[in-house]
Amino acid sequence: LYDSAGQKGNRNDVTGKKILGYYDVLVPDGRQQPVDIGTLWLRTFRFVQLDITTADEPLQLHELYNDFCAYPFEMKARFDADDASLEAIRHVSWRTARLCAGETYFDCPYYEQLQYIGDTRIQALISLYNSGDHRLMQQAIAQFDQSRIAAGITASRYPSNQLQLIPPFSLYWVAMVHDYYLHVPDTAFVKSMLPGIDQVLGWFERQVNEQGIVANLPWWNFMDWVPKLPRGVPKGATTAEGSAMVSLLYVYALQRAADLHQRFGNAAIATRLQQQIARIQQAVRRGMYQPARGLFADDAAKTSYSQHTNILAVLTHTATQPQALMQRVLSDTSLLQATIYFKFYLFRALKQTNLGHLYLPQLGFWRQSIRDGLTTFPETENKMRSDCHAWSASPLYDLPALVAGISPAAPGFQQVEIAPQPGTLTRIDCSMPHPAGTIVVALRKKADGNSLSGSITLPPGIGGRYVWAGKSRVLRPGLNVLE
């Protein structure tokens, strides 16, 4: 629905607005008995408008209804805290995630309905932490592997009847395989992906210039919908000088691939990947760091600075003072700002630098979207295109993984780490599905505000560790009481 100025405005307000978008033309055949007619493919909607034109005979409309169609995910997680807005965010996020999953994951159910790697990595983690169902994730990983072209990289989206190539998305696929390895006890499947991973990384290795920076990239090198980046492509990505942002994403993938090869006994390959990691990191530190600002630039000429490049510097351990860098990332408004998609990686960096207490104040976009009448979360902050986009459902992962602090401490989730970062919350009751059962975390902040009490319950046969205030405690299967 759009108003006279072409704006959507509050989605609950329909007065004076017009529907502009997809439509179907249905032509009854004139028979007297009732007949069901509908669309040839699924449609997603907030409002439906019927425009009926009759000829010599009236049209009798007996019933208008819809059938809900989605992958059968079941919500098996819980997150309750002393902030009621978080439950509303979870509710809208879950609706968003459900509508973006059918026979494959969708980036959105209204427009492309395509399984894009950048979107799918986030969707898959949401699925694991809330339903425990890894099947659509496994299928997506296999399909992306099948999409690889002869040169070595994956398609940006697959299945699709039109080939599109976004080279950075191939690096997220490598990370997605590593995610699966950490969360799902299925080493045979992960091992079968190693040849494809090597092909992707081999393609990127051939794109590294003499200085050690990824450069001269062909095709569409989208990183984020930053308004000042043409089509979301970072400075230097398609030129000879190269891009720090893409180089660090390459390191991010290399680190995960090296871990996989090391764990599967391919020590020589792991060593070679580690050498490439060191080479790229050294090149980025030498050529892209600006000491006066304490920031990594996007390009060698140091004409562009973004949150993205510095977030990736933190996530890849390229930054030597990661916590201080993250504080600058949040405070320096002159940086190109991460949009809703790349905030997923901003939040991973907050967790990694023990700044997770700053997560809850970052949820303004989600709270405002609900006030704007959205019942699903949109693609970008301007809220003018896709009103339902799966990557914006990331709080469903952030709340258990960052705030409650639940993450794998060993492959296949065979060990668990609970490292909560509750911020201003004084109470957290969280549970999530695990391959061996259910993880339950119940925490209460004590009166001093600096310590926690409560309990952590792990599935049978699953141990782990509890991390708080720089100290670690062993967790055993079953109930663990925190005094």
Where would I find each of the regions flagged by the language model?
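Extracellular/oxidizing-compartment recognition motifs
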Residues: 1-110, 119, 135-140, 155-159, ...
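Repeat-solenoid scaffold signature
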Residues: 332-365, 369-372
